[in-house]
């Protein structure tokens, strides 16, 4: 019985990937140049450390543009009281500025303000200069540009390259830490 169950799970994983109607929006948590088709939506959730969860709803406005909202909740899987990261949801926006061709990759410009982990606030006072910062344990991607090229050589093979800059989550004390 265990043998047949393993075969069933293996075949289900293989064939479910073939039927995917659109390219991946993210590789785990790293953005790609995939966008949602017009009129479609996704509802995803990401489990993070300390029993946190980040639900995310994204909607395809056009074939090249989508917008999403997410909200970080800490202690979701815990006996503690729920702790919401911020009073407002975070935003994800992605616009494909160049469609993938036979020779050139697809290119997207995006914004993701959702960081991972707890939202931290620190206020230093006393002998030090007053330093105020608010940021996530793992900073949000911020503004990013990603290029993706896919091949059907060995199934579905893709190469994704990108750059990002988060300009609003800063820490004046640990400014050298990119995370």
Which role does the model predict for each range below?
Residues 7, 154-155:
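Intrinsically disordered, low-complexity segments enriched in polar/charged small residues
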Residues 17-153, 166-167, 177:
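Transmembrane beta-barrel domains of Gram-negative outer membranes and organellar outer membranes
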Residues 1-2, 142:
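Intrinsically disordered, low-complexity segments enriched in small/polar residues
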Residues 158:
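Mobile, glycine-rich extracellular loop/lid and propeptide segments
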Residues 161-179:
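A mid-sequence, solvent-exposed acidic-amphipathic segment
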Residues 3-15:
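Sec-dependent N-terminal signal peptides
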């Amino acid at each position: 019985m265990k043998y047949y169950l393993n075969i069933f799970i293996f075949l289900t994983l293989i064939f479910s990937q073939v039927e995917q109607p659109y390219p991946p929006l993210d590789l785990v948590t790293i953005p790609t140049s995939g966008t949602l088709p017009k009129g479609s939506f996704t509802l995803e959730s990401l489990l993070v450390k300390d029993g946190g969860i980040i639900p995310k709803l994204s909607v395809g406005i056009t074939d090249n543009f989508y917008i999403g909202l997410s909200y970080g909740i800490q202690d979701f899987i815990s006996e503690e009281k729920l702790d919401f990261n911020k009073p407002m949801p975070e935003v994800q926006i992605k616009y494909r500025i160049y469609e993938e061709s036979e020779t050139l990759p697809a290119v997207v410009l995006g914004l993701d303000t959702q960081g991972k982990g707890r939202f931290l606030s620190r206020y230093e006072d006393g002998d030090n200069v007053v330093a105020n910062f608010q940021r996530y344990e793992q900073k949000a991607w911020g503004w990013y540009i990603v290029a993706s090229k896919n091949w059907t050589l060995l199934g579905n093979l893709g190469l994704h390259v990108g750059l990002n800059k988060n300009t609003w989550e800063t820490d004046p004390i640990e400014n050298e830490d990119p995370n």
